[in-house]
Amino acid sequence: MKINITERRNKYVKIKQKLAENLCKKDFIDRTRRLYMNKIKLFAGALTFMTTMAPPIHVYAATASHAELNAAEKNIDLDKSVNLQNSINLTDEIAKENQDSNIMFSPTSLNFALGMIAEGAKGETKNALNEYLGTDDFAAYARKYMNVIKSYNTEDENYGYTSKLKIADALWVNRGLTLQEQFQKNAEDNFEAKAEILDFSDKENTCNTINAWCNENTDGLIPEIMKPDMLNENSELCLTNSLYFESGWSQDPWDVSDEKEKFGDNEETKYMTSIGDNYYENDAATAFEKYYANNLSFIGILPKAEGDFTLDELDIEGLLKSEPEYDEVNCKMPKLNFETTAELSDILSRIGLENVFSDDADFSGIADKAVHVSSVLQKTKLELDENGTKAAAVTAVTMECMSAM
C-alpha cells in the first residue's frame, strides 16, 4: 500500500496514551528560542541519512533534524564501516559555504558513490578513499546495507501503511571506454550497479538519460542531476547513487498552526506541534525523537548555545547513544520544504581526498584509460509536514581522462 503524504492520514494514526500532567514533560523547540538564524542544516546521512550503531537514515538540522534507519538488530556495525566524524566534518564544511541557506546533505549517498570508485582504486588513491570511508571493504558494507534497506519496504502492521526506503546505483560509460572486467563485476555484485554505454559527445542525450534514471529512482523528487556543461571532451565515466525515503508518522499526529509565525530572523512559516517519543540531552544540545512506520525515526536536535555552531560541537554521536531522559516531550517545529545542490570537489580535497582529483590518481582498476575524478555533485530535497516525510538524495561522480604527460 503506497501512502501519499500530501493527504491526511488520520485513519492510520494510533494515538498513544499521554502521561499525566504532573509527570516529566518538557517543552521543546519553543519559537522564542533562537533557531540558528533562519537556517536549517540537514545532515541526511547514512539516510541512509548516519549513526554509529547501524546503517541508517539520518537527518540533522540546526534545530537539527535527523531521520534514523535503526538497524542494530540487523547485525550491521556502522561504527566499523563508515566514518561518522568525516561525515560530520563534511556537513560543517558545506554549511560554511552556504551560511545564508538551508542545507541538506546525504553522507550515505556520497559514501556509496565513493565506495564504487574505491573498487577500482589502487595505491595512495585507494588508501585515501579507505581512510575517508572508514573501511578497506566498503563493498561488504554496501551489500549488507542494501539488504537491510529492502526489509523496510513493507507494510507496518501496527499502523496499516508502508514506508518506502530505496537505494540505487548506476555506471554511465562513454563509448570507447572499456571498463575492467573485475570492476564491472564488483559494481554489479556489491552495488547492483549496471553499466550503460552512452555517447558523451551527445551531451544533451547523455544528460537526459542520466536524469531520467535520477527522476525514476527518487519518485520525481529530484528530476535531474546532470547538465550538458558538466561534460567535456575528456569526460569518460559517471557514477551515480540515489536514495529515497517516504513515510507517514506512526504515533501522535502533528497539529498545524493556522497562522504563520516567525522562524529565525526573517522567515515566517507555519509551525507544527506534537508529542515526541523520547527526549535526549547533553551539555551542548537537546533532542526529541518521533517515529515513522517500521521503526524508522526522526530526531530533532536543538543546540543550547546561541550563535553559530558546528555539528561537531554538539557531540551528536554521544547524544544519540545516550539513554532518553523522558519518554514523552512536547515538540514544536516548522514545516520544511527545500532542496540543496552542493559541488563537493573542493571540500573533499580539503579534507583528505585531493589525490582522487589529481593526475596522480590511480584508478587503473576501473578502466583501460587513466582517469581521475573531475566533479562530485550532490542534490537533495526534503518535504516534511504534518502527514509525513519525503527525502531524496542523488550523488554524481564524473571522471575524466587525465591530461597527456
Question: Which residues fall in each region the model found?
Answer:
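Internal alpha/beta scaffold segment
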Residues: 303-325
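Short acidic/histidine-centered micro-motifs embedded in hydrophobic/aromatic stretches
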Residues: 131-132, 174
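Sec-dependent N-terminal signal peptides of Gram-positive bacterial secreted proteins and lipoproteins
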Residues: 37-60
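Short, Lys/Arg-enriched N-terminal segments with co-localized hydrophobic residues
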Residues: 2, 7-14, 18-36
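Active-site-proximal helix-loop elements at catalytic-domain edges
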Residues: 5, 15-18, 68-73, 322
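Non-catalytic, conformational "gating/processing" segments within enzyme and secreted inhibitor domains
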Residues: 62-67, 71, 100, 138-305, ...
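Flexible propeptides and autoinhibitory/regulatory segments associated with cysteine proteases
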Residues: 60-129, 220, 224, 403
